[in-house]
Every structure is written in structure tokens, then in C-alpha cells.
Regions:
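Polytopic transmembrane helical bundles with strong interfacial aromatic enrichment
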Residues: 1-154
Length: 154
């Protein structure tokens, strides 16, 4: 039952995270408004929660060996590709995370959406978000290949 629960939570987090990062990017491409800012903040929060759940369940599944022994993953090039995509996603998230925290503080202090949401950085964060979504899809492709036995010698 643990194996099923972890796998389900892992995939739910993946789906929520993918939808949230796309929604964040879409909201940040809109003209500055209270609604766009609220949607961007909400999507960003879901993206963060989903990422913690996704990474947490993934590590648990890996280290506990609930699917395959950890050694299977360590020698599989598709696992290495997956981890590479994850590291890129995390690296791309640093600047947007810091910027969105700053914007949240400014909004909480009563700043007008036009003053809080700087259009240039918002467009860049939107682009980063869409690149991150693509990297998530590439992670899924690598995971499917790995789960089907590709990357290991028979």
C-alpha cells in the first residue's frame, strides 16, 4: 500500500506542479493587475508545494527502494538525465523565487499591482516558467524510458 500511495502522490505532485508553473507563466504575461498578481502568487505557491511533495516522494521512492533497488537508478543514464533536468529546473527557480518573494512583500505592504509587478522581470519569469514546464515534460520522458528498462544492459 505504501508503494501505491507514494507513486500516486508523486504523480499528483507532478501534475499539480506542471499546471501551476504553466499558470504562473501565463499570469505573468498578462498586463499588471490585482487579478494577475493574485493568480501568479497562487500558482507560484502551488508550484512550490508540488515541488516539495514531488521531490520528497521521489527521494523516498528512490532511497527506500519501493520500485527498484537504488543501484538500478544510479547506473541508468535516463535517471541521470532526469536528475539533470531537475537540477536545471531548480537552478532556473532561484531568481523567480526571490523576485516573487519581494513582490509578495510589496503587495502585502499595500503596493499597487502596477508598482509591484515589474513588466520586464515578469516576462522573464514567465519565460523561465515555460522552460521549466518543458523540462518537467522531458523528465517524464526520461522516467518513462527508465521505467521501461531502457538504459540498462541485459
Amino acid at each position: 500500500m505504501l508503494r501505491l500511495t507514494l507513486a500516486a502522490l508523486h504523480l499528483i505532485a507532478l501534475g499539480l506542479g506542471l499546471g501551476a508553473v504553466l499558470a504562473r507563466g501565463t499570469a505573468l504575461r498578462e498586463p499588471p493587475s490585482a487579478g494577475a498578481l493574485r493568480r501568479a502568487f497562487r500558482a507560484d505557491a502551488v508550484w512550490g508545494i508540488a515541488a516539495v511533495l514531488w521531490i520528497g516522494t521521489g527521494l523516498w521512492r528512490l532511497l527506500a527502494g519501493t520500485e527498484k533497488a537504488p543501484g538500478y537508478y544510479y547506473v541508468n543514464p535516463y535517471f541521470h538525465a532526469k536528475m539533470g533536468f531537475l537540477l536545471l529546473i531548480l537552478a532556473l527557480e532561484v531568481w523567480p523565487m526571490v523576485t516573487l518573494i519581494r513582490w509578495r512583500r510589496a503587495a502585502a505592504a499595500g503596493g499597487a499591482p502596477e508598482a509591484v509587478l515589474d513588466a520586464g522581470p515578469a516576462r522573464r519569469i514567465a519565460t523561465f516558467s515555460h522552460v521549466q514546464a518543458l523540462l518537467v515534460v522531458l523528465m517524464v520522458c526520461a522516467a518513462v524510458a527508465m521505467a521501461r528498462g531502457y538504459g540498462v544492459r541485459s
